[in-house]
C-alpha cells in the first residue's frame, strides 16, 4: 500500500514537472514572439453577452501574425467598447494590439417575449418581435399591414426602443407608437414611408427623433411628435413633406426647430411648433407654405418673427401670445386671414408692414404692444387705421398717415365698385 502511494506521488510530481516545463516553454516562446513586429491581427467573439453587459478579454480569441511569420494568441489587448449597448441584436467593436486593430461583430443575447406577423400581403414576411430588454424589432422584408387609428398588435405591450431592419419597407406608420410614454429611442426609419401621422405622438420620454431625412417619399407628418415633452433634437424635414400640422406641438424642451428649407412641396404647417416654449428662434419658412395658422402660438421665448412666404394665405394666430416677440414680420398682400396674428405679443415695437386688404384681420394686435415701446404701422393695406383702433393700444401708431389715408380711400373705392 505504501509502495502504491509512493508511486502515485512520484507520478504526480513528474506530471507537475512536465506541466511546469511546458508552461515555461510556452511563456518563453510567447515572450520571444510577442517582441516581434506585428503584421496583423484577427479576432473572434467566443463568449456570450447580454444587453448592457461589460465586455472582458475572455470573450475574444485574438490571433497575432508577425512579420517573421510567427502566429500566437494575444493574452492582453484593448477593447474599444467597454460594454454592450442596451438595444439591438449586435454591435461592432474594435480590438487593438500593439498598434494593429481589427473589428469584431458581437451578437447580443436577448430573450423573445412576444412576436407578431405583420407583413403585407403575406403576414409571415415581416415579424414584429419584442425582447426582454425592451426592443421592438421589425425583421423580414417587404411592406407591412396598415393599422387604423394606432390599433397595432403591440399597442398594449411593454417596449422602450424601436428598430427597423433595412429590408422592411412600410409605407404607412400612422400612430404606430402613439402614447408609449416609456419609449426612449428609435433608430433610422425606413426610406419607404409615405405617411407618419401621429407616429410618436405623446411619447413623453423620446429625446431625439429617429433619422428620417432620407425618407424621400414621406409626405404626411401631421402630429408626428406632438406631445413629446422631452424632445430636444430633430432631423431635418425631408424634401417630399407636404403636411406638417402640429408635428412638434407642445415639444416644450425643443430649443431649435428642424431645418425645413430642403422641402419643396410643404403647404401647411398649422400649429407645427405651437406650445414649444423653449424654442428661441423661428426657423426659415419655405416659400411653398400657404397655411401658417397657430404655427408659433404660445412660444414664449421667440424674439424675432421669421419672414412670411410671399404667397402665404393663412397666418391667423401665427405668433399669438409670443410674449417675448419684439420684431414682427411683414404681412404679405397674399394673406387672406391674419386674425390674431400678433395678439398678446406685449413686447412688440419698431415697425410692422401690412400689405393685405383682407377683412379677416380682427384682433391682429389685440392685447399687444403694451410694454411702452411704439409700434409703427406701414404698408399698402387700406386697413391700417382699423387695425390701429382695434389694437386698443396707445403705443400702436401710423408711420405715414397721409399714405394710410390714400390707401384707405383706394380700398373704399374698390369695395364700392
Model-derived features: where do they sit?
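N-terminal Sec-pathway targeting helices
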Residues: 1-14
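Sec-dependent signal peptide cleavage junction
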Residues: 21-34
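Solvent-exposed, low-complexity, repeat-rich "mucin-like" stalks and linkers
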Residues: 34-71
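Serine/threonine-rich, repeat-prone extracellular segments and beta-strand-based repeat modules
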Residues: 47-48, 69-104, 108-110
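Structural signature of tandem-repeat unit edges
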Residues: 81, 135-142, 157-171, 181-195, ...
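N-terminal segments that cap or nucleate solenoid repeat domains
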Residues: 113-161
